Amino acid sequence: MDYTMDIKSFSGGINEYTTEGLLKLNEAVKSKNCNTDSGSLKTIVTPSLIKDFGERIVSLMPYYNNTIEDYLVGIGTQIRNSNNSSLLSYALSGSKLDSLNFEYKGKKIFVFCSELDNVGMIGELGNRKLKNRRISYNKEGEIDGYIDANGVKKATEAEITTYAPKGRFIELHYDRLWVAGDNENPDRVYFSTAGVNGADIEDWTSPIEEAEANQHGGFIDVRSYDGGKIIGLKVIFNAVVIFKNKTAYKVFGNSPDNYELVQLFSSSGAIADKSICVGNNGAYFLNNDGIYFYDGTNTNLISQKIKNTISRMNSNYASNSVAYFYNNKYYLAIPIDNSTTNNVLIEYNTLSNSFVLHEIGDISDFIEINNDLYFSSGNTVKSLTKGNSYLPLYWETANYDFGMKNARKNSSYIYFRGKGNGSVRFRVITEKKEKFIDIPLTSTETLYRKKLKNKGRMFKMIIENVNNSNIEITNPQLLVEVDLD
């Protein structure tokens, strides 16, 4: 009696959680460098070089220069543009940066923070540190001076020598800048004013009287009493969410006079700060257990299907993990085994709830630019989605017994639709032996029927691209005769 090992779709991705005997045929026990978005099995490109900066890149940031979409890099103590020119007249203490682009006073600006340095800006309003002062008005409502953070009044803004706070994380919410991650105050979140005279990102001063709360900036101390510090700051569901090592909090309210701090959830392990991404009406993040999704009410583990990969994560360097949400996918680069840098890229398709893994190493940051996903790797910036060569593809099914464990089986033909510029290799493995066939593909989709004989009681199929060729395979079917005697 004839049966088929029929892979109707590859959309299930990799599944390291379910017992192999219970895996669906659209899932793989092992895979690498596959695109399964449309249900077919496709190769992915080798990331292409955008620019080599000659020194290791720590941060990669989008930058909107008028109408031009560009990027900046953090290298050493500098912020450089895509031409490798430094943009600041002063040296930073480090180049691990967080940043924002927005319009302020009718001008486009880039605002950044770097943990040990005061918040700074680059753009049409100058390249400098942000100051911390409040504007003083006379009875007629005219500006009559500036009062610094120490309460000392100055005649001109140029005389102000007090500056915006320090921090590693920055967000914009209701016209206020929010900053956290100050080494000297690791539980503190600062915010600028958005008072009666509009947003002022250079007024972080605390109100002198309670009635003035909405006219100034200020800060909130987020005490968790578990030894944790703030390691992330995101705007989710139109609210500021503060991530600490093992907990997360939400700031309810739209102005200082009604701010309320509420704990959202606690975590069983340290959260990797650069793994936190907002997408699909929630937040994704990594901790020691795996990848979690917070939907505004509940926090759920979603990475069971790649539990073996997560278990290999080098916990000593997990804080180096970086992520980005792009085209309904959560991309997460992590270090596994003995690697100190990120050497595996996890791609989670939120629409199909499936995972694929890519062998792309040393990813230190991501940005979306020009409808593409760029990443930094060592000294270079690369494109993840554009390239002229292809990575080695590998897809391995579970062992399949056709529901008859003890029956003898013989395979005869492999059927599939395919196209490409090289050859595809099908390997059929049983408990007795392995057989394979390399099949040259045409550039237009063609129906193929090729002999592929093997025998045994359990069948496994492995699909690969020969010599890193570009291939696309749809609905492979292995015809098998089962001896029921």
Model regions and ranges:
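Beta-sheet repeat architectures centered on beta-propellers
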Residues: M1-N81, A91-I109, G228, S267-G282, ...
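Disordered, low-complexity "stalk" and linker segments at domain junctions of extracellular
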Residues: D2-T4, F10-S11, K51, S85-Y174, ...
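Beta-propeller and closely related beta-pinwheel folds
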Residues: T46-R56, S89-L97, N138-N320, S354-V356
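Structural signature of WD-repeat beta-propellers
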Residues: G74-G76, S114-E115, G181, F243-N245, ...
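Short loop/turn segments that connect beta-strands within beta-propeller blades
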Residues: N83-S85, E124-G126, G253-P256, T297, ...
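Sequence-pattern detector for short linear motifs
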Residues: K131-N132, S136-Y137, V179, G422, ...
